[in-house]
Amino acid sequence: MKTTAAVLAAGLALTLAGAAQAQEFQPKAAGTKMLNVRVTSVDPEAGDPITTLAGAATGLRAEVNADVMPTIGLSYFFTDNVAVEVIAGTTKHTVTAKGPATDVKVKETWVLPPVVSLQYHFAPTAKVSPYVGAGVNYMIFYNGSDKNNFDLDIDNGFGFALQAGVDVAVSGPWSANVDVKKVFFETDATDNRNGVKSKVKLDPWVVSAGFGYKF
């Protein structure tokens, strides 16, 4: 959570600076496109039990570390208030099996988790413009590297996301942005070599801060 807190703090500083400096600015409106470039923390909330393929307890749980990445988001406003946003970026995570006397790396893997959200912007013509959204995501696990004699398969799949954020005008088409998403995603992780599996609820917090440009 330390990286998430750092990204959120940086984003709040950006938005406060933007609010203080904003003079003439371009408001949100129907037909507007917005490109957002952000620094994003992805912090999974894993910790589910690892069982044998027969369902017996092993006393271990699956943990997944956080990572920080650059992300790109593109929004299109259908009306002054309603927009759709697509974001993409990729992170690298380590899956670890943990127990009372165990702390073993199982796999390192890259994750591509694009999210498509439908948003409602409450004050499109204001300098400080908050919004909420909801959407779907698809988790793609790729370029994995197994560790310590494990052979782990992690299933790709769909999840859904809730979102809240704020855009603060800086100057002209430029704005500062803070965005928080909660992604709900569950997957199966199977170790083919050792005959164990885990149904892992990743459910990451996705916290971003950056700048947007309207065109």
Tell me the role of every PLM-derived stretch:
Residues 1-22:
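Gram-negative bacterial Sec-dependent N-terminal signal peptides
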Residues 15-51, 120:
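Outer-membrane beta-barrel biogenesis signature
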Residues 18, 31, 80, 124-130, ...:
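Short coil turns and loop connectors of transmembrane beta-barrels in diderm outer membranes
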Residues 24, 36-43, 72-146, 204-215:
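Gram-negative (and chloroplast) outer-membrane scaffold detector with strong preference
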Residues 47-54, 95-103, 142-151, 188-195:
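Outer-membrane beta-barrel translocator domains and adjoining extracellular loop/strand segments
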Residues 48, 93-97, 171-215:
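Predominantly the C-terminal beta-signal and adjacent terminal strand-loop region
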Residues 55-73, 77-79:
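Aromatic- and Gly/Pro-rich amphipathic surface segment
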